[in-house]
């Protein structure tokens, strides 16, 4: 009888270990006045492609609220090969792919939600296809993930829902890391939407530790990264207003974000948390046209000269640029975008 009971307990423990993720050891960046090893790698990458693609692509909207049915996402194809090939030929060293935007629609088959590609008009696992292509073509991959989720956590004022939603997020981050790293390393996590709650309500420490435990090379950044000395959670502190020693709004993190702004000149690099100083480069995000997501009426394009000027300013001072190039409803980058990137690479002599 005791043996049978012990066996039942062992089975239960095995079930728990299989169906939950172990809590990682808490880790933090090392205080430093200079860039660390992986920050140097990030600075060396210098230039990448930002890819906004998802359910918003099919509604001519930048932000939707989670009410659009998954079936309305229906690209005729997913030409991940073209996306990666275009980035590589443009002299870009990596891609940042939007995996889930504010509405909560996931570009992979997630076991945590039905609001994903598996229940849509095209069931291709976009995240995995891009990961495979990045590996095949020799370009690095980072992932964008919105903390704010208007499907799973629409009522952000209800603090009682934080614990369940934080578990949901951590589960999805584990899911993404495990899936992508079967094919290629993840070099960056780009988090967004933190302004919808006070910074202390987000599980930044757990997210950072989870990522670093499985992907130590991965750099973690949260949009609108810096606060004010008298209000560390102030939103937003523009680049020109950031001063050396200002508090890190979302700690731990490794680099600064504040889209769509470019860094100040001179650009401060040293910021603080609990009396310690950390080096943090700036990553700029710039749209090649007028929108983040593809819109049928988006006909405003920057010129090659404009883009060249933005590139020079954004990548000076050991900073980084990702240029947003959104695929259309056929799952391809627009011909005009491809030509602009090609012409820009020639002008800047990028390889």
Question: What does each of the following model-derived ranges do?
Answer:
Residues 1-24:
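Bacterial Sec-dependent N-terminal signal peptides
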Residues 23-351:
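Mature catalytic domains of secreted/periplasmic carbohydrate-active enzymes
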């Amino acid at each position: 009888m005791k043996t049978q009971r012990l066996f039942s307990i062992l089975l239960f423990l095995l079930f728990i270990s299989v169906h939950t993720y172990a809590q990682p050891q808490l880790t933090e960046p090392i205080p430093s006045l200079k860039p660390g090893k992986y920050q140097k790698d990030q600075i060396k990458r210098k230039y990448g492609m930002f890819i906004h693609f998802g359910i918003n692509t099919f509604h001519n909207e930048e932000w939707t609220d989670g009410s659009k049915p998954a079936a309305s996402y229906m690209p005729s194809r997913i030409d991940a090969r073209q996306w990666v090939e275009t980035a590589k030929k443009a002299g870009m060293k990596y891609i940042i792919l939007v995996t889930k935007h504010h509405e909560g629609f996931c570009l992979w088959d997630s076991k945590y939600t039905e609001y994903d590609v598996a229940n849509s008009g095209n069931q291709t696992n976009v995240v995995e296809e891009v990961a495979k292509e990045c590996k095949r073509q020799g370009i690095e991959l980072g992932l964008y993930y919105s903390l704010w989720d208007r499907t799973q956590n629409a009522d952000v004022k209800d603090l009682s829902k934080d614990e369940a939603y934080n578990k949901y997020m951590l589960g999805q981050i584990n899911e993404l890391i495990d899936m992508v790293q079967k094919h290629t390393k993840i070099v960056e996590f780009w988090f967004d939407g933190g302004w919808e709650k006070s910074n202390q309500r987000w599980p930044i420490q757990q997210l950072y530790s989870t990522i670093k435990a499985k992907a130590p090379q991965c750099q973690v950044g949260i949009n609108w990264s810096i606060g004010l000395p008298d209000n560390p959670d102030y939103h937003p502190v523009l680049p020109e207003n950031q001063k050396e020693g200002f508090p890190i709004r979302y700690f731990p993190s490794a680099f600064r974000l504040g889209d769509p702004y470019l860094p100040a000149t001179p650009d401060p690099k040293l910021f603080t948390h609990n009396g310690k100083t950390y080096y943090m480069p700036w990553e700029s995000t710039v749209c090649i046209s007028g929108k983040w997501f593809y819109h049928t009426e988006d006909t405003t394009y920057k010129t090659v000269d404009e883009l060249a000027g933005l590139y020079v300013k954004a990548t000076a001072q050991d900073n980084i640029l990702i240029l947003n190039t959104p695929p259309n409803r056929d799952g391809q980058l627009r011909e005009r975008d491809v030509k602009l990137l090609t012409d820009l690479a020639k002008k800047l002599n990028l390889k």
